[in-house]
A protein has these predicted regions:
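Alpha-helical solenoid scaffolds in eukaryotic macromolecular assemblies
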Residues: 1-159
Length: 159
């Protein structure tokens, strides 16, 4: 378990370095982020990870992204898009995917992911989420209706 947590933490080194270099977070804040993510990841790696563990991790990543966006605006951080501009949203999507692999039958979790895709403007992830949700919940009229509306409005595809 410790090896897999260490691997996850090592994978985030480039994005954390980029966030520090761009000025989103200080070195001390990066240490706190790493410690918090490590604690959350240990909870997810347990034999019986709970739904609330995944939701807690997702909420932490969402709040971290809100803080990053706020600081970008406040500090007038500009320049070319880099790893730090997308890594937290990508990590949040991965957490949703891991959670929904384990809790496939919970329709409210699928709705949460779909809403996150919409709010983060993640079109590819939205397609993926809607497709998987429709496959696993073929009798859910709400998902089919939302998928049809999204396909029509965002992809301009009426068929």
């Amino acid at each position: 378990m410790a090896d897999s947590v260490r691997r996850v933490l090592e994978e985030m080194v480039p994005e954390l370095e980029d966030m520090e270099q761009k000025g989103y977070f200080s070195r001390g804040e990066i240490r706190v982020i790493v410690q918090k993510r490590q604690d959350l990841e240990y909870n997810l790696q347990r034999r019986a990870a709970l739904k609330k563990d995944f939701l807690r991790s997702i909420e932490y990543e969402k709040s971290l992204e809100r803080l990053r966006v706020l600081r970008k605006k406040q500090r007038n951080i500009e320049g070319a898009s880099s790893l730090s501009d997308h890594c937290i949203v990508r990590r949040t999507h991965k957490l949703y995917e891991r959670m929904l692999r384990k809790f496939k039958g919970d329709l409210s979790l699928w709705n949460d992911w779909i809403q996150f895709c919409a709010s983060s403007k993640s079109a590819r992830q939205m397609s993926k989420a809607l497709t998987r949700a429709m496959q696993l919940h073929p009798n859910s009229a709400a998902i089919w209706t939302y998928a049809a509306a999204w396909e029509f409005e965002h992809n301009h595809n009426a068929t």
